């Protein structure tokens, strides 16, 4: 079959043309993109058949999946002969699917027009029709509604996510494998999700190397960064101190080599991508019903913690060669002992070898859309799927995370310990539940960016290690992307009942049962690509707004927050819709985003520092108020049944003469029924079949906010949220200064008020500056743990 021109789908599909010609792409890839002409020259007034459209999408998805699977660090050309043959066969299979559907099944030869290989018509004219240019510029499929807003299609088909090499001094550096996990912890990797204790309480026997139990206090001391080179090569140390993206010369070189516009690190990107997840998923809830979390915690309606919804703040900086860097805004954060401890614990838990003692490569560089994103390599295991690389996280217990300043004021000591697997407090389960609500989304995004298999978590209380857990990425996807609302649930049950009635229980289980986990993984991957493409468009629009206002800038602060906006339908009904608000403030060249220092600082001094920080940001905003820009982002979802899921069963065909006409018509109507038609386009996207995910497309609308006072209000709103969060991290909430008698009286009065239904929530904490109820509980459990530890040590001395 000959080649066809490269106009990629019809304008009706709103997919940007894809230029093929790179030598890195195989014959099969170039061929399948040329077949995209199938819909370009459709006769006027004729709609593209849905089945043809969906099968073309399906074939392209197959190519994407095959390409992504085979385009990691190693080049296709460097693979062994058997690997290349398998790759070629898979590509041929995708092409043959497309040929069959277009040429044989649908008889749509008239939609195809043969052209020479590599021919890209500049412009084509049809009698009585508009003339369209062969190529379009950013962004794809813009539709302008007025001077302040436009809509475009988020283009997933063109996005490639692959690991790239770093060429240093003209020599291509091969990615060196990170170290293996040590201390006998390898078996944790092969028992995913299991919460595994370091030591058994009953027998006092260790399940892993006892050497990992006690944490060296030296790990709490931050090492000097003055002798560290400003690149990510990490020469001369087993693990490099974190280099912010805008200071990383190696990262800049990779972006220049691969002609990318933006550079960042996975940790700097996750806060933004989290906000985009809330936008694209319409605040999808977490699903822990089928997880290892017991009924000690609420199974339904599990949402993220309050801190997970905090606004994202990043700094966009202009670099050389038209490249921009994206860094987290550290000015609204603090130096935290857990970050320093985590860095050295991650190094401690891995094996030491001569090969890894002086690493020349400590990162994966991921090419995604217009980004090069750097991911730290923590550990590797050859038996894990994919790259075999996984992230290593150390997780402090709840008593530390919810009351960090109190623990720091106590010389980084807490008696709170983990002594069981399950339970509301002092358990691994409690820590896993808190991780799911506050950090799981961030962990999953970091793993996906770096093409890692999963996350290894070590639970500790700064002084001691208590347990371990391995979380594969597909399990994280299931928790984050598999929940659905009651309306979809009722539709799914109705559809399943009908499908069981048509095919029978056995065939339903074997062939038609919904694969929840596969759907969640496909949704996660597609949403991630959409998020990266959307963020690229957001950054370009910020630059465009700043440039159009004649603002000279080298760096700017961007604050993003997805919120719920109440809207009214044409029928008069009110409904909620997610909207992403974006505010960008140009910064002076001398601006530095330094973290707040809290060591050896009193509450009074910290309070003054926070007030100064608020005042500084006020002055900064007033100074650049005229240059302040912003806009809001809305999205609408479009998807439908994939044709592979709507085929009539053989027994319902007329030629088989099994059913009467009425029964055949009933089955035909049921198979053709559009189960998606009543689902609003702004609702959380859910899918009945895994193949339907490939039809998911999103329209995004940018609406400029020209009112400076609205922008000012949004800026201070998000600033105050960040400052309040910072205050809760650094200000120690002291126990109320009252006598035992007064404490008893207050407690009894509060109990009486609750019983008389007169509780107005005032008893959540003893005073405005006292500990919260949860902090009070955790401090009590810490005292209980300290007493238990003393009794155990005394008992051990007695037996000796």
From Swiss-Prot:
<dbReference type="GO" id="GO:0005739">
    <property type="term" value="C:mitochondrion"/>
</dbReference>
<feature type="compositionally biased region" description="Basic and acidic residues">
    <location>
        <begin position="219"/>
        <end position="229"/>
    </location>
</feature>
<dbReference type="InterPro" id="IPR013943">
    <property type="entry name" value="Pet127"/>
</dbReference>
<feature type="region of interest" description="Disordered">
    <location>
        <begin position="219"/>
        <end position="240"/>
    </location>
</feature>
<dbReference type="Pfam" id="PF08634">
    <property type="entry name" value="Pet127"/>
</dbReference>
<dbReference type="GO" id="GO:0000959">
    <property type="term" value="P:mitochondrial RNA metabolic process"/>
</dbReference>
<dbReference type="GO" id="GO:0000964">
    <property type="term" value="P:mitochondrial RNA 5'-end processing"/>
</dbReference>
<protein>
    <recommendedName>
        <fullName>Putative mitochondrial translation system component PET127</fullName>
    </recommendedName>
</protein>
<comment type="function">
    <text>Could be a component of the mitochondrial translation system with a role in promoting accuracy of translational initiation.</text>
</comment>
<keyword id="KW-0496">Mitochondrion</keyword>
<comment type="similarity">
    <text>Belongs to the PET127 family.</text>
</comment>
<dbReference type="GO" id="GO:0005740">
    <property type="term" value="C:mitochondrial envelope"/>
</dbReference>
